[in-house]
Amino acid sequence: MNSEKPDYNYLFKIVIIGDRKTGKTCLMNRFVENTWSEEYRQTNLLHFKVKTIYIDCKIIKLQIWDSQADENFRFNNNNLSNYRSASGFLVVYDCTNENSFSNLKHWIKDIKLYGRPNAINIVVSNKSDLVNEKVIDSDVAKSYCDSLEIPFIETSSKHSSNVEDCFVLLIKNVMKYLETEPTIPQQQQQQQQQQQQQQQQQQQQQQQQQQQQQQQQQQQQQHQQSSKTKIGCLIQ
């Protein structure tokens, strides 16, 4: 049987994470459906939307997941499977909310702990349209992201400013990684080889220690026999 070829070149799973009320759902809706609502609705169920885009003459199919945040605005176990299978993350904070910016370090740490080794992430400063309410300076945010070597972009889902650009930036970085870095199976193979080498080294060290112990025991036995022989000669 001939299996049908997919109608895309790449399939990427993108997860949007960050504190509550940072506009994660609005970003997804604006990008996928070009809609926006001022009414806040808490994300209680895991859900995703699909969008196909074209980048560098490639057809990219995206699965975009809206994540949950628990009552402490932190990692929720319901998101674990999404973290493990995500190609990239949009880490969103609200530029009018200082706590959401301070919590970036926790979200980025969660990606390292629970995400794939080659997952790509970018930081998104959302609600850039609220100029008079802004409390996080753009230069401060960019400097922080530069120190972590993470791309940074400002968006407004309300005005549709840079919304598409933030997704395209993430996808281009994912594609760049795939072109320049080893795949996950290759990484796993390298890790297995390293583990095997370490095990072999440990076995060799154990064998050497056993040989040394045997030699010491033989020397002790020889010394004891020699002492007994000398004592026997003296008695005679």
Curated annotation (Swiss-Prot):
Lipidation (S-geranylgeranyl cysteine): 233
Compositional bias ranges of the Low complexity kind: 192-225
Primary subcellular site in the record, as a coarse category: membrane
Membrane topology: Lipid-anchor
Region (Disordered): 192-236
Extent of motif Effector region: 40-48
Gene Ontology cellular component list: endomembrane system; plasma membrane
Gene Ontology biological process: hypotonic response; intracellular protein transport
Propeptide part(s) removed at maturation, as residue ranges: 234-236
Record-listed Cysteine methyl ester modification sites: 233
Binding site for GTP: 18-25, 66-70, 126-129
GO MF annotations, alphabetized: GTP binding; GTPase activity
Keywords per UniProt: Cell membrane, GTP-binding, Lipoprotein, Membrane, Methylation, Nucleotide-binding, Prenylation
UniProt-annotated location(s): Cell membrane
Pfam families: Ras
InterPro entries, alphabetized: P-loop_NTPase, Rab, Small_GTP-bd, Small_GTPase
Cited PANTHER family: RAS-RELATED PROTEIN RAB
Xref: NCBIfam families: small_GTP
Family membership noted in the UniProt record: Belongs to the small GTPase superfamily. Rab family.
Protein name (record): Ras-related protein RabY
Species: Dictyostelium discoideum
